[in-house]
Amino acid sequence: MWVEGLSAGGQSLVPNPSPKQALGSEMHHELQTLADPGAVARAGAAFVADRARAAVAANGSFHFAVSGGHTPWAMFAELASETVPWDATVIYQVDERVAPPDDPDRNLTHLTKALGSAPAQVRPMPVNESDLVAAAASYAALLPEHFDLVHLGLGPDGHTASLVPGDPVLSVTDRLVALTQPYQGRVRMTLTYPALARARQILWLVTGEDKQEPLAKLLAGDTTIPAGRVEAAASLVMADRAAA
């Protein structure tokens, strides 16, 4: 695994998104219901591997953004049994807590462990820079024009990425990466709605009874929850029976 460093002094090489890109209630979600969290992890891994092979065959690389939470790490464990072109894979973070390196709260800590020796390029969010606003702008400069795949989770409160109810970051339309207010004790760096709209495909992994209500709202296109405002070219929801 190659973890790429980042200087906070970079400038975005891509145009700022327009507000029109940021919000959307017409998103159609395909739902796949599976037996349990293990089945969700296995199906998610197979889907990621298939998308990776297709992207590399078509364009020579696979640009994949990964959220935190519990579901992605089980999926990554299942990826060990899949054929993935890791040497042509670039992994980005959807969100990250502002915490010291190797802190167990860091999504990067879990991502690094999950990848093991897989030779993917990892572009971590620079949450240890002294100027986090400049660091967020620098990370935005690294983002591709399109993500081949973005993984998202769904919180019981309807949040996704670190786009949480009531946070001012929900209204950001002119930046691809932004900082949140403290949530569960941590400030977060997160991709914004315009950044998520760059996804050619979104994969939602949703498990547990406490996700029933937010999942129903997501599938209904309910924009009163943050997850319901995500817009992308295509969306697949893999949920276990407890959530669905």
Where are these regions (language model features)?
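A glycine- and small-aliphatic-rich helix-loop capping segment at beta-alpha/alpha-beta transitions
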Residues: 78-86, 109-112, 165-173
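Glycine-rich beta-strand-to-loop/alpha-helix junction loops that act as flexible
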Residues: 66-71, 152-156, 207
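C-terminal functional extensions of proteins
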Residues: 198-244
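Class I SAM-dependent methyltransferase SAM-binding "motif I" and its flanking Rossmann-like core
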Residues: 149-194
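Glycine-rich N-terminal segment of FAD-binding domains in flavoprotein oxidoreductases
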Residues: 57-80
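N-terminal glycine-/serine-/threonine-rich phosphate-binding loop
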Residues: 26-64
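Ligand-binding beta-strand-loop-alpha-helix segment within the catalytic cores
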Residues: 28, 86-151
